[in-house]
Regions:
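N-terminal alpha/beta PP-like core and its mobile active-site loop of ThDP/TPP-dependent enzymes
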Residues: 1-312
Length: 312
């Protein structure tokens, strides 16, 4: 089905699209770039049209971590918007955390206007709009995000929103970065159509190679001292039970090294603690499950006869 917005602006359509795609909250730390967005929130409230709930947050780092916390509880990514380059710079600590923890967030910022003269909506109207100009604002966040894009035309708005959500939610999950200049956001239209629900399929979970799983099963059966080292397998709560069952059934000790999530209950009989170093010499099979650094080679490494299998 197609939904139509009449007599609006691109920022009206942007908020409507976010709401339609399941975005509940819009965490913002505003500046002059937010003018079209603020008008659209006011219009949505007055008319009762769909839009995420606006949350004004006093610091960018807090805004990012509110979105990360919401995802941790609900499994649904949210939107954060900050003020041009300075807001982006202030938010980078949170974006690094999102990237490190594979947490999807639709991170966005305004961009100083392009237009210096004329009557185009959103044009430069303050002195600060000149010093805020950057050659490549996306470069501030590019190393920490899965994808970045600058919106230049309403014709691609639906595609950009859907692609942003799709990329953020595809494993391994993580943040994306959108820059939103004032002129496109303030652009008016008589009619804007978008598809609801999205034409983009929900990202599916990658399926392991059955032959590789068979080989691993054979190695487990023949191992004398197998060991599992994990860190983030518990990011998916559905993985906790199977790991507990596997380690219990085959008596495989589990180490949660630098864990950011609960991967195995601490009272499980096969819970071997949080440091892998004391056990590397004895293991003849190590299964590394969703762990970035299972050991530090300059400190301790597995023995020469040990087989190492990575899963993640």
């Amino acid at each position: 089905p197609v939904k139509t917005i009449s007599d609006g602006t691109v920022s009206d359509a942007y908020l409507a699209l976010l709401a339609d795609r399941g975005i509940n909250y819009f965490f913002g730390n505003a500046g002059t770039d937010f003018a079209p967005i603020i008008e659209s929130f006011a219009k949505a409230q007055a008319l009762g049209t769909p839009a995420p709930k606006a949350m004004l947050v006093p610091h960018e780092n807090l805004a990012i971590h509110m979105a990360l916390g919401y995802y941790a509880v609900t499994g649904r990514p949210q939107v954060v918007m900050v003020h041009v380059n300075v807001g982006t710079a202030n938010a980078l600590n949170g974006i690094i955390n999102a990237s490190r923890g594979n947490i999807p967030v639709l991170f966005s910022s305004g961009r100083t206007p392009y237009s210096e003269t004329g009557d185009r909506e959103g044009r430069r109207t303050r002195e600060v709009h000149w010093p805020q100009e950057m050659f490549d604002q996306g470069a501030l966040a590019r190393e920490m995000v899965k994808w970045d894009y600058e919106l230049k035309d309403k014709a691609v708005l639906e595609t950009v929103v859907d692609r942003a959500i799709n990329i953020a939610m595809t494993e391994p999950r993580g943040p994306i970065y959108l820059t939103l200049p004032r002129e496109p956001l303030a652009e008016k239209f008589q009619s804007f159509d978008f598809t609801s629900p999205s034409r983009n399929a929900t990202p599916t979970v990658a399926w392991p190679d059955p032959n590789a799983i068979d080989q691993l099963a054979s190695r487990i059966a023949n191992a004398e001292n197998p060991l599992i080292i994990t860190q983030d397998s518990g990011a998916d709560i559905n993985a906790v039970g199977p790991l507990a069952a596997l380690s219990d059934r085959f008596a495989i000790p589990v180490i949660q090294r630098k864990a950011r999530y609960l991967c195995l209950p601490s009272d499980h009989p096969m819970h071997l603690g949080y440091d892998s170093d004391p056990y590397l010499d004895f293991a003849d099979l190590i299964i590394v499950a969703q762990c970035d650094v299972p050991w530090i080679p300059s400190v301790k490494s597995p023995g020469p006869g040990c087989t190492v299998v990575h899963m993640g």
